[in-house]
Every structure is written in C-alpha cells, then in structure tokens.
UniProtKB/Swiss-Prot annotation:
Lineage start: Bacteria, Pseudomonadati, Pseudomonadota, Gammaproteobacteria, Pasteurellales
Entry GO CC: cytoplasm
BP GO annotations: rRNA 5'-end processing
Family per record: Belongs to the YqgF nuclease family.
Knockout-associated phenotype: Controversial; it has been found to be non-essential. Has also been found to be essential.
Record Gene3D superfamilies: YqgF/RNase H-like domain
Molecular-function GO terms, alphabetical: nuclease activity
Enzyme Commission identifier(s): 3.1.-.-
Descriptive protein name: Putative pre-16S rRNA nuclease
Length: 139
C-alpha cells in the first residue's frame, strides 16, 4: 500500500509545497504559501492538509554543505514541530542541501530566465525534498 506524503520547503517569505505518492516515488508541486518572517497562514496550511490527507509530512531541513546547522535550520525545525503540534500529523525532516540550486537549474532548462519565479522554485524544491525522502526513507 502506498503512502501519500506532503512536503514543505520552509522559507521566511515563501514556503514551497508538494504532494506525492510512495508507489511512484514522484511528487507534484502545489502553490507555495506566503509567509511573513517564517510565519505562514496556518488556516491555508490546515486547508491543504485536510484536502490532501497525507499519511506523512516532510519538512526540508536546511543545512550547510558540511552538514552543520544554520540559522534557518532551527526555524525549519520549529515549523515542523508546530505542524505536528497543531495538526497532529506525522512529521519527518529531510536534508534539503542543494534542492534550491537544483530546482533553479531544472526550471531554467525548461523556460529560461522568465520561468525563474520564486513560488515555482519553492514548489520544485519541495518536490525534490519529497522525492529524496521517498528514495532514502524506510517507511
């Protein structure tokens, strides 16, 4: 039986989102959530969770290239804890190193500079985070 997973690419201004299935190991970008200093519209997040009913939620963990934590790492952990606390969802953290760089590269290849919109980058980053989790997680 497959697992439905929802992924978030946490950011202080925008939070990317993607939905995916473990059977295919693929993800599809959803519209990004606007955030103010890392605080999302929690009603919009709740609506998304109710609509998609994920078995698990994945939050990208921003780490430095050497694996050490950075300022945004703590904020992403806090976001993950709030998701779990507010909505009772099963949350996992996934290393997201280089996902934004890879997302920009993929979007640029498809549509050039005009395609490089922040919300689109965040959504593709969330897809990459989720697909990485499908590949490496033991569920």
């Amino acid at each position: 039986m497959g697992i439905t997973a929802l992924a978030f690419d946490f950011g202080t201004k925008s939070i990317g989102c993607a939905i995916g299935q473990s059977i295919t190991g693929t993800a599809q970008a959803l519209p990004a959530f606007k955030a103010q200093d890392g605080i999302p519209n929690w009603e919009a997040i709740e609506k998304c969770l109710k609509e998609w009913k994920p078995d698990v939620v994945i939050v990208g963990l921003p780490l430095n290239m050497d694996g050490t934590e950075q300022d945004l790492t703590l904020r992403a952990r806090k976001f993950a804890n709030r998701l779990q606390g507010r909505f009772g969802v099963n949350v996992h953290l996934q290393d997201e190193r280089l996902t934004t760089t890879q997302a920009r590269s993929e979007i640029f290849e498809r549509g050039g500079f005009k395609a490089l919109k922040k919300g689109k980058i965040d959504g593709v980053s969330a897809c990459l985070i989720l697909e990485s989790w499908f590949e490496y997680a033991e569920y």
